[in-house]
Amino acid sequence: MSSLSSAPFGRVVTAMVTPFAADGSLDLPLAARLAQHLVAHGSDGLLVCGTTGESPTLSWDEQLALIKTVLDAVGEKVPVLAGTGSNSTAEAVEATREAAALGAHGALVVVPYYNRPPQEGLEAHFRAVAAAAPELPLMLYNIPGRTGCSLHPATTARLLDCDNVVAYKAASGTTSEVSALRLACGSRLAIYSGDDGLTLPMLAAGAVGVVSVTSHLAGVELSAMIDHYMAGRHAEALALHERLLPLMEGLFCTSNPTPVKAALELQGWPVGAPRLPLMPADSSVRDTLSTLMAALRPT
């Protein structure tokens, strides 16, 4: 488990892909092996059933099975967060309760999507989720490019009177989001980068870690980059950032998680194609990823 008081879920939290078998069903044994591999290669926290885990295409029974599988595999070593967000408050409340009952160490709760509630509605939504499982630490997740609305810093600051609101995934695509949150919330909120390529500048603005996709492939290097920065070795951190950036950007050349699943396949992890409506990576994406991963190998 993480002992980093300022980073309650660890510094590198991998937003884990969901492996599928050839028939499209969950491959739970592979999910367990992948979780163990990630923890052994730089991840000090895991998130299951997030965007990268294709939660919109998973039934709730599948999500519960996946959460339990990953908890059984690595839950005694690192924090395991469950994605429990929904644009229905009642569904988010129930999902969060069930994740807590399974023993999850935290929940990632996304801003309600599509129905675009006002700030008052967002505040009421998150308060209801927090009250449903008061013992379960929550990470709020702001990603306006996917949800159609944004959680404002002032609203976030008001939510800090819920004792279990402890962290925030910043995925608006700007480092200024971190600065605005720091001004509104001070050090009471652990801010995580939700964009691999912005992790280093977000650390400089006050973030404590990253919820990462790239860590599937370069977790050791990403962890080292953060360690260098936190220890004041900024030149070393910058060098690693620049080395990783092409891969970080390449993993978002089309809709996530299509590229990272293809990259894992290229590394020998048969995680399967994404479920529809997402599509498998085409040959040009696979060729690009192969080149980018080759560039990271030691010479």
Curated annotation (Swiss-Prot):
<dbReference type="InterPro" id="IPR013785">
    <property type="entry name" value="Aldolase_TIM"/>
</dbReference>
<feature type="binding site">
    <location>
        <position position="211"/>
    </location>
    <ligand>
        <name>pyruvate</name>
    </ligand>
</feature>
<dbReference type="GO" id="GO:0008840">
    <property type="term" value="F:4-hydroxy-tetrahydrodipicolinate synthase activity"/>
</dbReference>
<dbReference type="InterPro" id="IPR005263">
    <property type="entry name" value="DapA"/>
</dbReference>
<keyword id="KW-0220">Diaminopimelate biosynthesis</keyword>
<dbReference type="GO" id="GO:0005829">
    <property type="term" value="C:cytosol"/>
</dbReference>
<comment type="function">
    <text>Catalyzes the condensation of (S)-aspartate-beta-semialdehyde [(S)-ASA] and pyruvate to 4-hydroxy-tetrahydrodipicolinate (HTPA).</text>
</comment>
<feature type="active site" description="Schiff-base intermediate with substrate">
    <location>
        <position position="169"/>
    </location>
</feature>
<keyword id="KW-0457">Lysine biosynthesis</keyword>
<feature type="site" description="Part of a proton relay during catalysis">
    <location>
        <position position="114"/>
    </location>
</feature>
<feature type="active site" description="Proton donor/acceptor">
    <location>
        <position position="141"/>
    </location>
</feature>
<keyword id="KW-0704">Schiff base</keyword>
<keyword id="KW-0028">Amino-acid biosynthesis</keyword>
<dbReference type="InterPro" id="IPR020624">
    <property type="entry name" value="Schiff_base-form_aldolases_CS"/>
</dbReference>
<comment type="subunit">
    <text>Homotetramer; dimer of dimers.</text>
</comment>
<dbReference type="GO" id="GO:0019877">
    <property type="term" value="P:diaminopimelate biosynthetic process"/>
</dbReference>
<comment type="pathway">
    <text>Amino-acid biosynthesis; L-lysine biosynthesis via DAP pathway; (S)-tetrahydrodipicolinate from L-aspartate: step 3/4.</text>
</comment>
<keyword id="KW-0963">Cytoplasm</keyword>
<protein>
    <recommendedName>
        <fullName>4-hydroxy-tetrahydrodipicolinate synthase</fullName>
        <ecNumber>4.3.3.7</ecNumber>
    </recommendedName>
</protein>
<feature type="binding site">
    <location>
        <position position="52"/>
    </location>
    <ligand>
        <name>pyruvate</name>
    </ligand>
</feature>
<dbReference type="InterPro" id="IPR002220">
    <property type="entry name" value="DapA-like"/>
</dbReference>
<keyword id="KW-0456">Lyase</keyword>
<dbReference type="GO" id="GO:0009089">
    <property type="term" value="P:lysine biosynthetic process via diaminopimelate"/>
</dbReference>
<feature type="site" description="Part of a proton relay during catalysis">
    <location>
        <position position="51"/>
    </location>
</feature>
<dbReference type="Pfam" id="PF00701">
    <property type="entry name" value="DHDPS"/>
</dbReference>
<comment type="similarity">
    <text>Belongs to the DapA family.</text>
</comment>
